[in-house]
Amino acid sequence: MDVNPTLLFLKVPAQNAISTTFPYTGDPPYSHGTGTGYTMDTVNRTHQYSERGKWTINTETGAPQLNPIDGPLPEDNEPTGYAQTDCVLEAMAFLEKSHPGIFENSCLETMEVVQQTRVDKLTQGRQTFDWTLNRNQPAATALANTIEVFRLNGLTTSESGRLIDFLKDVMESMEKEEMEIVTHFQRKRRVRDNMTKKMVTQRTIGKKKQKLNRRGYLIRALTLNTMTKDAERGKLKRRAIATPGMQIRGFVYFVETLARSICEKLEQSGLPVGGNEKKAKLANVVRKMMTNSQDTELSFTITGDNTKWNENQNPRMFLAMITYITRNQPEWFRNVLSVAPIMFSNKMARLGKGYMFESKNMKLRTQIPAEMLSSIDLRYFNDSTRRKIEKIRPLLIEGAASLSPGMMMGMFNMLSTVLGVSILNLGQKEYTKTSYWWDGLQSSDDFALIVNAPNHEGIQAGVDRFYRTCKLLGINMSKKKSYINRTGTFEFTSFFYRYGFVANFSMELPSFGVSGINESADMSIGVTVIKNNMINNDLGPATAQMALQLFIKDYRYTYRCHRGDTQIQTRRSFEIKKLWDQTRSKAGLLVSDGGPNLYNIRNLHIPEVCLKWELMDKDYQGRLCNPLNPFVSHKEIESVNNAVVMPSHGPAKTMEYDAVATTHSWVPKRNRSILNTSQRGILEDEQMYQKCCNLFEKFFPSSSYRRPVGISSMVEAMVSRARIDARIDFESGRIKKEDFAEIMKICSTIEDLRRQK
């Protein structure tokens, strides 16, 4: 029977159908090729917004820098980055007046964090610009390379393991006249392929030492690498995002810790909370404005959009904010926090890979690296690219563009939120000193503004005043993209409010389905996603039941594990049928072994193994979960695992799911093809770290693992632990005297080897 799709909406209030207009089904668009063009756009736009600022030359790197701070006041509605220092400081002062002690308390909290944070905090995060190799690396590898190079240059403070000590090394490294680095190089040789008899290029990787003078090192330390942001839905054009290097990361972390601590205390801040907590915060602000607007008052809400938030923010302004926020704090603390904005106001944006060229008859392809853009003849480029390059040329130094104004995406989300909230805070009646007043919400660059006034003129005046106040702080509310409604209907960070929040279910669509980790994890994640959506997103029981059936079907097709009594033929069906026939209690078989599905919407919280345990044959139990079975992977499994699910907006979320180690929790092996590429050296480094960490964890199982205090190395810690454990085992009779003696001997040998080294 054909269903007329409009029937679906007959009983649905219009606002609930918002889901259907979102571009979230199907694959998101990915970028291909280089991000060089997008990065040049960002750099050129940022300078254009601040073009009436003052130009100076950086004495250390020779980079031309534009400073728009305290620039001309706006005469029109075009976006500009001319924030006024005194206005920002005054906004901060008012924020503190409204929240007595907020800065003081946040500073104390942050100081504690600064003293306790370990350097391994920097291993979190994905891609990081590795300044030693001049390209992106996984964060852990980039950090290790940095520390290795620091040690090579006699900077060893960071060996204490505290992040603050690593930052001391960073500061010291910038004072050095030259830095010696270990970098990779490629050798290319032309050799004849035995199979095809064609000539092929063979690459090998070596490590070499290289010296950087102070200027060269500073340029690298201040460089942000750029990439194209992938998987952005609902946009025609791609845009560039930045990955900072290890020198900047630690300083940014502490600034953001302070800002996060402030945001937590501000009722108008949409960060750092999320989900239902954020909705509750929002609903509170709306309630406050609705109840306070008595019958005599009108209340309107702007669903706000700011033009190019990041490109008009300015690190110098952030420096002023931090200077104010920390004004009564110890000198060392103020210094640590001011490094990040100072580094950002001297930053360089790496232009990425450069341009690919193809000759018309397609015989030749060549890549023009970014370093060559400053000297290459422009006649090879089309008009728009030519204009971009001409504009950016004066700013280029060694393939990176000097970019003093602007913030690059996602670097200071919390601190910029504090700036936004400080304007919302000025809307109280005691500050506006007139009949209109405002309040709202701010989450990074997204905002919702609620204005109350006795009449429409008052509303208009309130909005105008808000708009102008924003301009003074370098924030440009877009008049084209913001829209105003009677309070009760608005959108904020993709939450739709219509007398209460409307579930925007389409946003969760990308996380339904089979994740592709392994059979065990996928089953668990799949049912957890359905469970979470029943709790948070108005997924009704009937729809949830249907989602579950679709998921099981999808799962069976993905892993070719149709029920043992099915007629569907797959590569696995022969084995599965055999298992089915020899199993007495067929209900006990896992779905991934061809068993029936016992899930329904009431028992989604129970891992499948636990759900079916009582129903399993004894010998099946013995194979499935036996730690001695070589196919049961216990390496990666803790009682709660984290999966990365992709919601439609915002970063990938981690989601907890229960995991039970079985023969189905395998970990796939790494793709072999990487071993033949230039990454091979890096892969070997990574495996070495992996091995060291695994070994360390063997000695310190998670139950007894306390962060090592003091400055003993990993080896010393493991040796002393081995001695203690051996003694306990020997005294309790778990090991024989000979074993005990041998363990002690090995420990001594290791210590001797360390001393000789």
Curated annotation (Swiss-Prot):
<dbReference type="GO" id="GO:0030430">
    <property type="term" value="C:host cell cytoplasm"/>
</dbReference>
<feature type="domain" description="RdRp catalytic">
    <location>
        <begin position="286"/>
        <end position="483"/>
    </location>
</feature>
<keyword id="KW-0945">Host-virus interaction</keyword>
<dbReference type="GO" id="GO:0019083">
    <property type="term" value="P:viral transcription"/>
</dbReference>
<dbReference type="GO" id="GO:0006351">
    <property type="term" value="P:DNA-templated transcription"/>
</dbReference>
<feature type="region of interest" description="Promoter-binding site">
    <location>
        <begin position="249"/>
        <end position="256"/>
    </location>
</feature>
<keyword id="KW-0696">RNA-directed RNA polymerase</keyword>
<keyword id="KW-1104">Inhibition of host RNA polymerase II by virus</keyword>
<comment type="subunit">
    <text>Influenza RNA polymerase is composed of three subunits: PB1, PB2 and PA. Interacts (via N-terminus) with PA (via C-terminus). Interacts (via C-terminus) with PB2 (via N-terminus); this interaction is essential for transcription initiation. Interacts (via C-terminus) with human PKP2 (via N-terminus); the interaction competitively inhibits the interaction between the RNA polymerase subunits PB1 and PB2.</text>
</comment>
<dbReference type="GO" id="GO:0039694">
    <property type="term" value="P:viral RNA genome replication"/>
</dbReference>
<keyword id="KW-0693">Viral RNA replication</keyword>
<dbReference type="GO" id="GO:0042025">
    <property type="term" value="C:host cell nucleus"/>
</dbReference>
<protein>
    <recommendedName>
        <fullName>RNA-directed RNA polymerase catalytic subunit</fullName>
        <ecNumber>2.7.7.48</ecNumber>
    </recommendedName>
</protein>
<dbReference type="InterPro" id="IPR001407">
    <property type="entry name" value="RNA_pol_PB1_influenza"/>
</dbReference>
<dbReference type="GO" id="GO:0039657">
    <property type="term" value="P:symbiont-mediated suppression of host gene expression"/>
</dbReference>
<dbReference type="GO" id="GO:0000166">
    <property type="term" value="F:nucleotide binding"/>
</dbReference>
<feature type="short sequence motif" description="Nuclear localization signal">
    <location>
        <begin position="187"/>
        <end position="195"/>
    </location>
</feature>
<dbReference type="Pfam" id="PF00602">
    <property type="entry name" value="Flu_PB1"/>
</dbReference>
<dbReference type="GO" id="GO:0039523">
    <property type="term" value="P:symbiont-mediated suppression of host mRNA transcription via inhibition of RNA polymerase II activity"/>
</dbReference>
<dbReference type="InterPro" id="IPR007099">
    <property type="entry name" value="RNA-dir_pol_NSvirus"/>
</dbReference>
<keyword id="KW-0548">Nucleotidyltransferase</keyword>
<dbReference type="GO" id="GO:0003968">
    <property type="term" value="F:RNA-directed RNA polymerase activity"/>
</dbReference>
<keyword id="KW-1035">Host cytoplasm</keyword>
<keyword id="KW-1262">Eukaryotic host gene expression shutoff by virus</keyword>
<dbReference type="GO" id="GO:0003723">
    <property type="term" value="F:RNA binding"/>
</dbReference>
<comment type="function">
    <text>RNA-dependent RNA polymerase which is responsible for replication and transcription of virus RNA segments. The transcription of viral mRNAs occurs by a unique mechanism called cap-snatching. 5' methylated caps of cellular mRNAs are cleaved after 10-13 nucleotides by PA. In turn, these short capped RNAs are used as primers by PB1 for transcription of viral mRNAs. During virus replication, PB1 initiates RNA synthesis and copy vRNA into complementary RNA (cRNA) which in turn serves as a template for the production of more vRNAs.</text>
</comment>
<keyword id="KW-1190">Host gene expression shutoff by virus</keyword>
<keyword id="KW-1195">Viral transcription</keyword>
<keyword id="KW-1191">Eukaryotic host transcription shutoff by virus</keyword>
<feature type="short sequence motif" description="Nuclear localization signal">
    <location>
        <begin position="203"/>
        <end position="216"/>
    </location>
</feature>
<keyword id="KW-1048">Host nucleus</keyword>
<keyword id="KW-0547">Nucleotide-binding</keyword>
<comment type="similarity">
    <text>Belongs to the influenza viruses polymerase PB1 family.</text>
</comment>
<keyword id="KW-0597">Phosphoprotein</keyword>
<keyword id="KW-0808">Transferase</keyword>
